[in-house]
Amino acid sequence: MARYRCRRSQSRSRCCRQRRRCRRRRRQRFRARKRAMRCCHRRYRLRCRRY
């Protein structure tokens, strides 16, 4: 299972790439949807949650 954590020290583009991966996973796994939303939502761009 993929784990993404975007830190403020990371570049924004790197964080966005991680979010894109996370979005793909969200489509694949309906059950993980809430957690994926937390990770991928624009509001959490600089601090993605691990799951």
From Swiss-Prot:
Keyword DNA-binding: yes
InterPro entries in UniProt: Protamine_P1
Keywords, sorted A to Z: Chromosome, Developmental protein, Differentiation, DNA condensation, DNA-binding, Nucleosome core, Nucleus, Spermatogenesis
Disulfide topology: none
Compartments it resides in: Nucleus; Chromosome
GO molecular function, a single term: DNA binding
Function according to Swiss-Prot or TrEMBL: Protamines substitute for histones in the chromatin of sperm during the haploid phase of spermatogenesis. They compact sperm DNA into a highly condensed, stable and inactive complex.
Protein name in UniProt: Sperm protamine P1
